[in-house]
């Protein structure tokens, strides 16, 4: 929390997203990033609609403007609990839009890179799994597949690692617009 507070201070006057306020540190991060320096606060919860909503409520009760909150409702790489993460995202979007729940109407950002590059398909070396092909290409594939799927499922933004993944997803978004 202290590092995030210092980061918010360092980018004072700029439009920055400070990741991540969690249940255990939302007061410090929310106060520094959202209140003192008027930054956007990333609210990170486990893959659970109720926890996401609760954190948004806590941040807004602290005084952070709801328009300055971006939710991270959790993620998983494609094939690794991904369906549960997507169903949570679907429920968040349904409650926000269909039911008009203002506490869930914040944009969603999904940190794809940390999930996609941490699975065995991306981590196994070519020496260990030669039949799987090039390790870097596998990581890129996992990142692109997961990013495309979460964007289709309601995420408003993704965090990617590899330049090829960024280019591929950027192209996909431009072609869909």
Regions found by a protein language model. Give the residues of each.
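Catalytic alpha/beta core domains of metabolic enzymes, predominantly
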Residues: 24-165, 169
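N-terminal active-site wall of soluble small-molecule enzyme domains
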Residues: 1-12
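Short hydrophobic/aromatic-enriched beta-strand-loop microsegments
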Residues: 14-20, 40-43
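Short acidic, glycine/proline-enriched helix-loop-strand junctions
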Residues: 169, 173-177
């Amino acid at each position: 929390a202290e590092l995030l507070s210092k980061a918010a201070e360092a980018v004072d006057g700029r439009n920055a997203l400070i990741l991540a306020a969690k249940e255990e540190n939302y007061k410090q991060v929310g106060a520094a990033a959202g209140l003192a320096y008027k930054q956007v606060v990333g609210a990170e919860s486990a893959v659970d609609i109720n926890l996401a909503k609760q954190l948004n409520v806590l941040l807004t009760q602290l005084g952070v403007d709801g328009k300055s909150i971006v939710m991270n409702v959790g993620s998983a790489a494609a094939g690794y609990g991904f369906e549960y993460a997507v169903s949570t995202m679907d429920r968040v979007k349904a409650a926000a839009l269909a039911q008009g729940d203002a506490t869930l109407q914040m944009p969603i950002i999904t940190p794809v890179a940390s999930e996609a590059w941490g699975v065995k398909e991306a981590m196994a070396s070519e020496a260990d799994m030669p039949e799987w092909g090039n390790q870097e290409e596998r990581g890129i594939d996992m990142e692109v597949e997961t990013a495309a799927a979460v964007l289709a499922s309601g995420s408003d933004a993704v965090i990617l690692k590899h330049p090829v993944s960024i280019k591929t997803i950027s192209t996909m978004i431009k072609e869909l617009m």
